[in-house]
Amino acid sequence: MIHQPPAGARDLLPLEVAQKAWINDNLQRVFQQWGYQRIVTSTLEWLETLTAGGAVDRTKVIQLQTAESQALGLRPELTASIARAAVTRMAENTFPQRLCYRANVFRHPPRGSHGKQMEFYQAGVELLFAAGIVADAEILLLLADSLDALGLEDWQLILGEAALGRSLLDPFPEPVRETVRHCVANLDRVGLQELPLDEDLKAYALDIFDLRGEPETILARVSQFDLGPEAQEIVANLKALFALLAGSTQKQLPIILDLTLIQTFDYYTGIVFEVVNFANHQSYILGQGGRYDQLLGLYHPQRENHPGIGFCLNIEELHTCLLTSPQLPKQLAGSAWLVIATEPNAQQQVFHYAQTLRQGDEMVRVEVELGGRSPAEIYAYARSSHITHLAWIDPSGEPKLETL
């Protein structure tokens, strides 16, 4: 088995690495334009850190043990680790912290999914110590700017509100509340209709089920519900957020308001969202995020809560959707120069000349011919590798230059 990676792992070959680096580099450039600074957290964390007080299912965490039998895990996402670092290492700075990252994450696949991928690559941002709709708007506008920088089209932002979604389920008896939540989140209308509910609650459940669509329409409908003061305030804030977004960009964000949206990780307290792209007759979740105003308090030494909001973008899905894009590199960048010794005793001069070329332009790629190939083989290699210049070096160090 040593000739293969383990089930769930995969190698990335140079062209795929170059393409994903192009995606990452463009995203990081946009993040930095918005004032975000890169942070790097540990791949290994205490298991308690990664589960975020139970908000992250520990069965999704790939676990390890120290020699002292202490439980560690490979991070299944970055937000918990960044929250921990922010409140323990940057606690003196309670003004807004703009942090970004590019990293790998690890997750156990669902049971019965042997061989499914366990390592994933993400890029994202976290805006910490910042509450309110202005911070929410910044994150959503940054997300749109990031996707535009990649030349992505046909994407939609599916946006919900975690606290409002939970409050809409309050009228249901506790024994069936989670089942209703599951049916609504998974678009299971038949399952919802078969639940043992009285007619009024069943009609209410179906009303909730249909709370997806154009933001203004959905907010008008939910405003007709018998909402408590907190839910009414959330609806008012959503209206203000959409008005702010509409007036802040020339290109309107393609938003679908879905008040039944539920995220994988259960630490969200405010807006939650997914970015979905439609390509090759399939839908891809390009990213997800939301507001988490109680997560930082789990790691703060004095348990002080601080607000936060962020998103992550899934590099594999972005790569898949961009494969037909003319912007994505379709071949590896070839070396500009191949330096060849005309005789075996000219090898020292070859290394000297190659280094002179590199020092003249730090961006130039220069290869040295290692010997053993005929001139015909050298020319064939240079053409197949998109090398544009050859330098034939004799024992005196004199170059003979060719352009292909």
UniProtKB/Swiss-Prot annotation:
InterPro entries linked to this entry: aa-tRNA-synth_II/BPL/LPL, HisRS-like_core, HisRS/HisZ, HisZ
CDD domains reported in the protein's UniProt record: HisRS-like_core
One cellular-component annotation, GO: cytoplasm
Gene3D superfamilies: Bira Bifunctional Protein, Domain 2
Entry's Gene Ontology BP terms: histidyl-tRNA aminoacylation; L-histidine biosynthetic process
Keywords: Amino-acid biosynthesis, Cytoplasm, Histidine biosynthesis
GO MF term set: histidine-tRNA ligase activity
Cell compartment(s), UniProt: Cytoplasm
Location, primary (coarse class): cytoplasm
Involved pathway(s): Amino-acid biosynthesis; L-histidine biosynthesis; L-histidine from 5-phospho-alpha-D-ribose 1-diphosphate: step 1/9
Family: Belongs to the class-II aminoacyl-tRNA synthetase family. HisZ subfamily.
Protein task: Required for the first step of histidine biosynthesis. May allow the feedback regulation of ATP phosphoribosyltransferase activity by histidine.
Assembly with partners or alone: Heteromultimer composed of HisG and HisZ subunits.
Additional detail: This function is generally fulfilled by the C-terminal part of HisG, which is missing in some bacteria such as this one.
NCBIfam families: hisZ_biosyn_reg, PRK12292.2-3
Protein name: ATP phosphoribosyltransferase regulatory subunit
The organism of origin for this protein: Picosynechococcus sp. (strain ATCC 27264 / PCC 7002 / PR-6)
